[in-house]
Curated annotation (Swiss-Prot):
Protein name per UniProt: Large ribosomal subunit protein bL35
InterPro entries found in the cross-reference section: Ribosomal_bL35, Ribosomal_bL35-like, Ribosomal_bL35_CS, Ribosomal_bL35_sf
Location of the region described as Disordered in the Swiss-Prot/TrEMBL record: 1-28
Family, per entry: Belongs to the bacterial ribosomal protein bL35 family.
Biased amino acid composition, Basic residues: 1-15
Keyword Ribonucleoprotein: yes
Organism listed in the record: Cyanothece sp. (strain PCC 7425 / ATCC 29141)
Molecular function terms, GO-annotated: structural constituent of ribosome
HAMAP family xref list: Ribosomal_bL35
Alphabetically ordered keywords of this record: Ribonucleoprotein, Ribosomal protein
Pfam families the record matches: Ribosomal_L35p
The UniProt record lists the keyword Metal-binding: no
Length: 65
C-alpha cells in the first residue's frame, strides 16, 4: 500500500497537542489592525482548539501527526 500524503497547507496551519487535539490560529489578525482594540488583538493572538466536529477532517489531512 502506498504511503499517505500529508496536506502541506494543513500541516502549516495546525499543531497537535499532547492530548491529541489540534490547535489553530485565530482569524482577523493579519492586517487592518489599526481600528481594532488592543484587547481584541491580544485575544486574537492566542491559539484556539479546533472544534470537535472538524477534528476528523483535520486528522485525515495530517495522517502522521
Amino acid at each position: 500500500m502506498p504511503k499517505l500524503k500529508t496536506r502541506k497547507a494543513a500541516a502549516k496551519r495546525f499543531r497537535q497537542t499532547g492530548t491529541g487535539k489540534f490547535t489553530r490560529r485565530k482569524a482577523n489578525r493579519n492586517h487592518l489592525l489599526e481600528h481594532k482594540s488592543t484587547a481584541r488583538k491580544n485575544k486574537l493572538s492566542h491559539m484556539a482548539i479546533v472544534d470537535e466536529r472538524d477534528e476528523e477532517r483535520v486528522s485525515l489531512m495530517l495522517p502522521y501527526l
